A protein has these predicted regions:
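Short amphipathic alpha-helical coupling elements at transmembrane boundaries
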Residues: 45, 60, 75, 105, ...
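Short helical patches
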Residues: 32-46, 198-205, 209, 279, ...
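Membrane-interface amphipathic/re-entrant loop segments adjacent to transmembrane helices
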Residues: 28, 33-34, 79, 215, ...
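Membrane-interface helix/helix-cap signal primarily in integral membrane proteins
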Residues: 1-84
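Generic alpha-helical structural context detector
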Residues: 59-63, 168, 233, 292
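Hydrophobic alpha-helical transmembrane segments in multi-pass membrane proteins
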Residues: 17, 70-253, 281
C-alpha cells in the first residue's frame, strides 16, 4: 500500500489542509527562482509548438516536466520498465554536461574555463528541471567528475556516489526512505560497484579465448556485455522496485538495450530544438525531427 505520509514527509510536506481559505499572501519570492521557472516555461512553449503529439515526452526528457505527458504513454513506459528515461537522470546529465564540456574545450576554452562554465550551467539546469533527488544526485556526481578533471585528479564512481549521497542526506535525511533516492543510488551501485566485479569475472573466463576472437566475436561480446550490464542494474534495483511498486517488468532488461542508445538522440534533438526556437522556429522544427521519429517508433 502506498505510504503517502512517508512520501510527502520526504518532500517536507507534513500537513494537508482541506477547504482552506487564503486570507493573506506573502509578496516576497525568489527572483532568480522565478527566472528559472520562466526559462523552463519558455522552452516548454517552444517544444509544444514544434513537437506536436510528442511534446509531452520531449518536455519530460529535456525539462523534467511531466505535466503534459499522456497518462497512457506514461503507464506504457512504466509497465515496460523504461519509465526512468522520462526522468532527468545521470544519463541525461552525463550526455548534456560532458557534451557541453567537450564543446567548450573545442571552441578554444581551456580545461579550467570550460569546466567551471559547464559546472555552473549544469547546476542551473538541475535547479530549472525541478531539483528532484535523482537530478541532484546526477548533478553532484557530474560536479565531482568535472572538478576532478579541473584539479587533475582521478574520479571514481563509488567515491562520487558516496559524496553525493552525503550531501543530499545532509540537506534532507528523510530522503533515505524515498523510493527515488534508493532507486537512483541503487542504479549507480549496480553499474559502479557490482558490474565491475561481474566484468572482472567475465574477463578472467574469456582471457584464454581473446587471441582467437574475430570481428564477429567482438561484436557478440559487446552485445553480451551490454545485456549483462543492463541485467546487473535491474537485479541490483529489483528489491527496491518490488518494495515500492510490487511489480517488475521482465522485458525491461531487453527493452533497455534498445531504448538507452536512442535516448541521447531524443535528448540532443529536443535540447537543440528548444535552444534554436529562441532564434528561429523553423530551425527548431528541423532539429526535433530525429527525436520525433524515434518517439513515434
Amino acid at each position: 500500500e502506498f505510504d503517502s505520509k512517508a512520501y510527502y514527509g520526504c518532500q517536507r510536506i507534513y500537513y494537508v489542509m482541506k477547504k482552506g481559505k487564503i486570507k493573506k499572501q506573502s509578496q516576497s519570492h525568489s527572483a532568480y527562482g522565478q527566472f528559472l521557472i520562466d526559462v523552463q516555461q519558455k522552452f516548454a512553449g517552444i517544444l509544444e509548438k514544434t513537437c506536436g503529439m510528442e511534446a509531452g515526452a520531449f518536455e519530460a526528457i529535456v525539462l523534467g516536466d511531466k505535466t503534459n505527458l499522456d497518462p497512457e504513454l506514461k503507464m506504457r513506459y512504466q509497465m515496460a520498465g523504461i519509465i526512468h528515461i522520462l526522468a532527468i537522470s545521470g544519463l541525461h546529465i552525463s550526455l548534456l554536461g560532458m557534451g557541453l564540456y567537450n564543446l567548450l574545450k573545442k571552441i578554444g576554452l581551456g580545461i579550467w574555463p570550460a569546466g567551471l562554465l559547464a559546472l555552473v550551467i549544469m547546476l542551473q539546469y538541475g535547479m530549472m528541471t525541478g531539483g528532484s533527488v535523482s537530478t541532484m544526485r546526477a548533478v553532484c556526481m557530474f560536479l565531482l567528475s568535472v572538478g576532478a578533471k579541473i584539479a587533475g585528479r582521478i574520479y571514481d564512481m563509488p567515491t562520487g556516489m558516496a559524496a553525493a549521497a552525503i550531501l543530499i542526506l545532509m540537506e534532507n535525511p528523510a530522503y533515505l526512505l524515498d523510493g527515488g533516492f534508493l532507486l537512483s543510488f541503487g542504479s549507480v551501485i549496480g553499474i559502479g560497484c557490482v558490474w565491475p566485479l561481474v566484468q572482472e569475472g567475465m574477463d578472467v573466463l574469456n582471457r584464454k579465448k581473446r587471441s582467437e576472437v574475430n570481428e564477429k566475436g567482438k561484436i557478440r561480446d559487446k552485445l553480451l556485455m551490454s545485456f549483462l550490464a543492463s541485467g546487473v542494474v535491474q537485479l541490483t534495483t529489483l528489491p527496491i522496485v518490488l518494495w515500492f511498486y510490487g511489480e517488475v517488468s521482465v522485458m525491461g532488461i531487453f527493452l533497455n538495450l534498445l531504448v538507452l542508445p536512442t535516448v541521447g538522440i531524443v535528448l540532443g534533438s529536443g535540447t537543440a530544438g528548444a535552444l534554436l526556437g529562441l532564434v528561429t522556429v523553423r530551425g527548431a522544427f528541423l532539429a526535433v525531427v530525429p527525436g520525433r521519429i524515434i518517439l513515434r517508433g
